[in-house]
Design a protein with these regions (language model features):
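Hydrophobic/aromatic-enriched cytosolic interaction surfaces used to assemble or bind macromolecules
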Residues: 2-310
Length: 310
C-alpha cells in the first residue's frame, strides 16, 4: 500500500513538474519581458493589505501590486505578447506567480481591449449590452458582457471579455473584479478637468497600438484604439481626429505616455505637427525607495492609473 502511495505521489509530482516546464517553455516563446521589478513569485509584501491588478491588453500582459493604504507600488512587471493571449497562458502566469494562493484585499482585472461602447446612462438597458457590442464589433468571438457605471460623465461603459478568458479567470480567481481601461481613463480625466485646457488629447501607447481620449470644452469627443506600424500612421490618425472634431493644432494640448521614447521618431514627429506636446508623468506614482525604475516615468502613467481609480 505504501509503495503504491509513493508511486502515485512521484507520478503526480512528475506531472506537475512537466506542466510547469511546459508553461515556462510556452511563456518564453509568447511573453517578452519589457520592464518590471520582480523575479519569480510576488512574495515580499503583506498580501492581505495589498491589491493586485492584472491588465490584459491587445498585445500585452501586465501585473502589479500596491499597498492598499499608501498606494505604494510594491511589485510590477510588463510583458509584450508575441501572440494572442490564451486561457492556458493566463492561468499558467497566475499560478506561476502564486496569485491564486494568496488572499489579497482585492484583485482587479483591467481589460485593455477594443470591444466596448459608451452608452448614455439614461438609455442603458442591461439586456441590450450583448446586442450593442455584437452590432459594433461583430459576433465572431463569444463575449461575456460587463459594464462600468460612470456617473460623473452620465454614461455607462459596456465591454466584452472573451468568454474563454473570463471563464478561466472565474475558475481560478472567482472573486476578482473586472474593469475596462477606458473607464479608468475617464475617471482619471474627470479628476483633471478643472486644470485642463479647452482642447486636449491624451495618447496612451502600447505595443502595436495606442488609445486616444479627445476632450473639447470639458466634453468627451471620442475614445478609440488605433493599430500602427510607423510614426506616419500615428500622425495620420491624430490629424484626422483634429479635423473631425474641429480642433486647433496650435491651441490644443497633447499628453503622451506609455511605451514611447522622447528621442524616437514618433515623439519627434508629433512635435512637428502639434505645438503643445509633452510626456505625461503621473504625479501620484509612488515606488518603493531603492526600487525606482530606470525607464522614463511616463512609461508607467497608463499602467498605474487603475489603482488610483477603483
Amino acid at each position: 500500500m505504501w509503495a503504491n502511495l509513493q508511486f502515485c505521489f512521484r507520478s503526480i509530482c512528475k506531472i506537475k513538474s512537466r506542466k510547469l516546464r511546459i508553461f515556462v517553455f510556452m511563456a518564453n516563446l509568447l511573453l517578452k519581458p519589457t520592464f518590471g521589478n520582480v523575479h519569480g513569485s510576488h512574495e515580499a509584501y503583506d498580501h492581505k493589505s495589498s491589491k493586485l491588478f492584472i491588465e490584459l491588453g491587445q498585445r500585452h500582459l501586465a501585473s502589479y501590486v500596491v499597498n492598499s493604504k499608501t498606494n505604494q507600488i510594491l511589485a510590477y512587471e510588463f510583458f509584450q505578447l508575441n501572440d494572442k493571449l490564451t486561457p492556458s497562458l493566463l492561468n499558467g502566469y497566475i499560478i506561476d506567480k502564486n496569485f491564486s494562493l494568496n488572499a489579497f484585499e482585492g484583485v482587479f482585472f483591467v481589460h485593455n481591449q477594443k470591444e466596448f461602447a459608451l452608452v448614455p446612462a439614461d438609455f442603458h438597458k442591461n439586456h441590450l449590452d450583448k446586442s450593442i457590442l455584437e452590432t459594433i464589433h461583430g459576433d465572431l468571438i463569444s463575449l461575456q458582457t460587463q459594464s462600468d457605471e460612470l456617473p460623473q460623465w452620465e454614461i455607462v461603459n459596456i465591454f466584452g471579455i472573451e468568454k474563454s478568458i473570463y471563464d478561466s479567470i472565474l475558475a481560478i480567481l472567482p472573486d476578482a473584479k473586472h474593469i475596462h481601461i477606458n473607464s479608468i481613463y475617464l475617471k482619471s480625466a474627470f479628476k483633471q478637468l478643472v486644470n485642463m485646457h479647452d482642447q486636449w488629447i491624451k495618447v496612451y501607447f502600447y505595443p502595436s497600438y495606442f488609445n486616444v481620449v479627445v476632450m473639447k470644452d470639458a466634453q468627451l469627443q471620442i475614445m478609440q484604439s488605433f493599430y500602427y506600424e510607423t510614426a506616419d500612421d500615428v500622425i495620420y490618425f491624430l490629424i484626422n481626429l483634429t479635423d473631425q472634431f474641429l480642433l486647433d493644432v496650435t491651441a490644443l494640448h497633447m499628453q503622451v505616455s506609455g511605451l514611447i521614447e522622447e528621442e524616437f521618431i514618433t515623439f519627434k514627429e508629433l512635435k512637428k505637427y502639434f505645438l503643445n506636446v509633452s510626456p505625461e508623468v503621473n504625479p501620484e506614482l509612488n515606488f518603493v525607495k531603492g526600487q525606482e525604475p530606470h525607464q522614463p516615468l511616463h512609461y508607467f502613467t497608463p499602467l498605474f492609473l487603475s489603482s488610483q481609480c477603483v
